[in-house]
A protein has these predicted regions:
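Acidic/histidine-rich, surface-exposed loop or edge segments in extracytoplasmic proteins
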Residues: 87-90, 155
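Active-site-adjacent mobile loop/cap segments within catalytic or ligand-binding domains
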Residues: 47, 94-193
C-alpha cells in the first residue's frame, strides 16, 4: 500500500494470497511486467532457535557456508542442484545488474536494521550477503531477497504477528525503494503492460 501511494511507482505482486508460486515463476512475472526492481521478502528460519536478525541477499556465489545452506533450503522446491546454480550464477555474474543489486541490498538492509531496532533492541544486523537464490536467477532487473526476521526465534516470531512490526518492515522496504529510485534517472519500479 505504501508503494502504491506513489504516483511514479507501479507495484506488481507475484502473489496476493498465501499460495505457493514456483520460484522461477516469480522472477518470470517480474520480467513479463518489465519491472525495474525485484524485491523478494522472506521470513528466515534456522535450526539454532536463538538465531535472530535481518539479512539481505543479492545474486552471486555464496560467500560463506551459512549463506550457501540457506540458499539450498530456499531453492529446494526448484529441483535445481547447487552445482547447476553455480554455473548459472557464473553466467549471470557478467550482467551489469550485480552492482545495482548490491547497492539496493545495502539500502534494504540498513533500513530494516534501523526501523526494527527500536522495537526489537536485540535484533542482529546480519548484513548484506550474496548467494545463488533461484528466485533471483534470471531477473532482468536489480533484485534482492530480504530475510526480515526469524520465524524459528520465538521472540521474533511473536513480533512478526504484530501489525506495528510488520508495518515497520513495510516502511523500511518502502524507504529503500524510494532511496534507490532517487539514485536513478526516470525509473519506475514496475510498469504494467
Amino acid at each position: 500500500a505504501l508503494l502504491a501511494s506513489q504516483p511514479s511507482i507501479d507495484v506488481v505482486l507475484t502473489r496476493e494470497t498465501d499460495r505457493f508460486i514456483p520460484l522461477e515463476e516469480r522472477t518470470a512475472i517480474a520480467n513479463r511486467q518489465r519491472a525495474d526492481l525485484f524485491l523478494s521478502i522472506h521470513a528466515n528460519a534456522s535450526t539454532n532457535r536463538k538465531a535472530r536478525g535481518v539479512e539481505t541477499y543479492f545474486l552471486n556465489f555464496a560467500t560463506n557456508p551459512e549463506a550457501e545452506a540457506l540458499a539450498a533450503r530456499e531453492n529446494a522446491s526448484s529441483g535445481r542442484t547447487m552445482a547447476r546454480l553455480q554455473d548459472l550464477v557464473q553466467t549471470i555474474a557478467l550482467n551489469n545488474k550485480l552492482d545495482e543489486s548490491r547497492e539496493f541490498a545495502e539500502m534494504v538492509q540498513g533500513g530494516l536494521d534501523q526501523k526494527l531496532r527500536s522495537v526489537n533492541p536485540q535484533i542482529r544486523d546480519l548484513g548484506v550477503k550474496q548467494a545463488p537464490f533461484v528466485v533471483l536467477i534470471g531477473a532482468d532487473m536489480p533484485s534482492v531477497l530480504a530475510e526480515v526476521s526469524f520465524l524459528s526465534n520465538r521472540a521474533e516470531a511473536l513480533l512478526l504477528k504484530q501489525d506495528d512490526y510488520r508495518q515497520r518492515i513495510a516502511q523500511a522496504l518502502f524507504e529503500a525503494v524510494l532511496r534507490y529510485q532517487r539514485t536513478l534517472k526516470n525509473i519506475q519500479v514496475a510498469s504494467q503492460p
